[in-house]
Amino acid sequence: MGQGESTPLSLTLDHWKDVKTRAHNLSVEIRKGKWQTFCSSEWPTFEVGWPPEGTFNPSIISAVKRIVFQETGGHPDQVPYIIVWQDLSNSPPPWVPPLAKIAVASGQDNGRKSAGGRPSAPSRLPIYPETDSLFLLSEPPPYPTSPPPPPAPHAARPAPGLMAEGLGSEGPAAGTRSRRPRSPTGDTGPDSTVALPLRAVGPPAEPNGLVPLQYWPFSSADLYNWKSNHPSFSENPTGLTGLLESLMFSHQPTWDDCQQLLQVLFTTEERERILLEARKNVLGVNGAPTQLENLINEAFPLNRPQWDHNTAEGRERLLVYRRTLVAGLKGAARRPTNLAKVREVLQGPTEPPSVFLERLMEAYRRYTPFDPSSEGQKAAVAMSFIGQSAPDIKKKLQRLEGLQDHSLQDLIKEAEKVYHKRETEEEKQEREKKETEERERRRDRRQEKNLTKILAAVVSEKGFRGRQAGNLSNRAMRAPREGRPPLDKDQCAYCKERGHWARECPRKKNARETNVLTLGD
């Protein structure tokens, strides 16, 4: 889409690689699904002006950050995400245009609200139209005592007049409850930045009474965003479990909303497993899971109950139902014990030890019924962490003295030391280059040595052939002599007789004897 229709959230999702790099530079880990969930669903409920499509407004980001960092009632799991948002606002990357060109809350809220707090008419069509072919679901009927629902349910197409005016600003939140025109209740209408099925519509009727709630059903855009941005429950149950756990706390869904979420986000087999696990987790009078059918049906009914959300009893029953449903989600997420799957989780060549430990603990949660963070399982997790780490880290950890006394945090510190001391890619290339040069030098030396031997052999053979050429005339004489039998120790080489050697042979002396002239001669 064009730059004029971009939102802060869509920009960050389109450039997610840059956002991940910035988070890595800040030494934090973020995930795409949670990034979108917190921006579009969680932070708008803080009532500080955060729009579901996100914003780079520093004041709004600081307000959200103060709530996230609260000592009591804070949200530690959201700390990395708001830190990255603030860093993007303080040091915007090149792909972030000026604030005036983005649909941020600071520029839109002033245009939405007129005197008296009423929102002005939006100007753009929603990105996700209200489709009735995506989810063939009927709108849950309103409770008897609640005010009538808005005239445009999520299963019906918008009227032509509304289509001409537009149903909301651009961004993934367009067309959701939070971006729809509010009901004609004047100043008593709910805040447009809060997307809750049950929302306060005015002060209590009595001084100590309950605040009346108005029912706003989920829209198809909400369901479409949640379904498309999270993996299936069978593939990775953590994503949808975290989403529904967050929705139960922030959106306060009714029984009908819970059934709609189960119908859209889960398959038939997954729904049956979740409901079965939830009914196993219904608490009895003593606070322990009960097996009494009447208590189970009362706390977690399978058929639509007549609970009034504007009474204390109805709200309490809805609260118990939501808690039980979350317990069922967590129970259904556990699979039969399969330690082979846990052993398949190995540390990657460039994977940080902390990220590897998180994957390992997630495998324990998915493929075993154990809680890896419990005291009884820390030893098993530690041994798996050591045995399945990278070879250099594994070698270092196995050499630690008193290994049984080290905690997981200690092992992580030691693994981080080895990880950060690894040679960089440039150092690795330089080392490989030096090793290649050294191998080539050794090969050249071997070749030179072999060549020297060959030359020496050639020279010696030439000398031998020269000696042979000089003695060609004696070849006939040498041939018989070479064939003579060897002499004995006391045998003469000249006369072949025994008892003397050739230099003492009398025959040889006689042959060489010459006449000596005397004075008389």
Curated annotation (Swiss-Prot):
Covalent lipidation (N-myristoyl glycine), chain numbering: 2
An example Gene Ontology biological process: viral budding via host ESCRT complex
Pro residues bias: start-end ranges: 139-153
Coiled-coil portions: none
Entry-linked InterPro entries: G_retro_matrix, G_retro_matrix_sf, Gag_P30, Retrov_capsid_N, Retroviral_Gag-Pol_poly, Retrovr_matrix, Znf_CCHC, Znf_CCHC_sf
Protein name as catalogued: Gag polyprotein
Pfam families: Gag_MA, Gag_p30, zf-CCHC
Keyword Lipoprotein: yes
